[in-house]
Structure formats: C-alpha cells, structure tokens
C-alpha cells in the first residue's frame, strides 16, 4: 500500500508541479487526497502488523528506533535550516517518518522469524540508501532550474516505491 501511496504521490507531483503548466485544482486535489488515503491506510496496516506480530526472537526495541528517528529529524531540521539555509518542508518529515516505519517493520519481520539477520541488514542498508538519496534530492531542490527540480522531485518517490515493492516481494517470497 505504501508503494501505491508513492505512485499516487508521483502522479500528483507530475500534475501539480509540471513546469509552465498549471493543472486544474480539482485534479490536483483528487490526486493529493488519493495519496493521503493510501498513505494513511499503509501506515495504519503497517503499525497494526507491527503490534500484532508475535516475536520468536529478540529484535531492537521499536521505541529506540522511534527515538532515533526523532533525534535524526531534529538534527536534520537544524542542519538543513541553519547551516544550509534550506526552507524546511513536509518532505523532511516524510523521509524520516518513512525510514522509521520501514526500520520498525524490518525489525518486526526479523523478530517474527520471517526475515533472517542477513535479509534484515540488507533492508536496513536499502532504507539508509533511499534516505541518503532522498535527503540529497531534498537539499538541492531549490537550487535547481525548473525542469531539473521537477525531475529531482520524482526521484525520492521512485526510490521509496521501488524499496517498498522489493520488501513486499521479499515478504511474499519468504511466506
């Protein structure tokens, strides 16, 4: 469902931010609502799954992952705003929020026995790579000319969508 959210977000971005052309407000609104609905459903399902899954081995406390995410967000907010003078937008919260949710989910899948330690580490590395790539795009966005900025806005969504499809495929394969 999070991959569907990324897909809806891609459509919205493509329509709403297409250079030199303004989409009808109703179309942009419908796509943004679809993105929000898919995102809320995905987060709800993932959180429910994380809480309802029985562990057969010990993982990292979800509280530690959440605390790390909060600290990471605050540090990145300060660095991006005060050091790089980049306007803080919702995307920073979404990047870090996705990473925290993804890491908690990988941890739950490890603790449940569905993912091995190796697969779990691979998904943690994939999550880190997507976050680094997304943060790079986030930081350079306002310094790009309009067409490059338009493409730059797509990249984090594509990376998240692919990562979520890979994780869904791994879960189905392991089941």
Q: Residue ranges of each PLM-predicted region?
A:
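Alpha-helical transmembrane segments of polytopic membrane proteins
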Residues: 1-4, 25-37, 58-73, 93-97, ...
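N-terminal topogenic module of multi-pass integral membrane proteins
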Residues: 1-59
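C-terminal ends of transmembrane helices
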Residues: 11-20, 75-86, 138-144
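Transmembrane helix-loop junctions in multi-pass membrane proteins
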Residues: 46-53, 81-85, 105-112
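Short alpha-helical packing/oligomerization segments
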Residues: 105-140
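Interfacial loop-to-transmembrane junctions
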Residues: 139-161
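Juxtamembrane boundary at the C-terminal end of a transmembrane helix
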Residues: 164-175
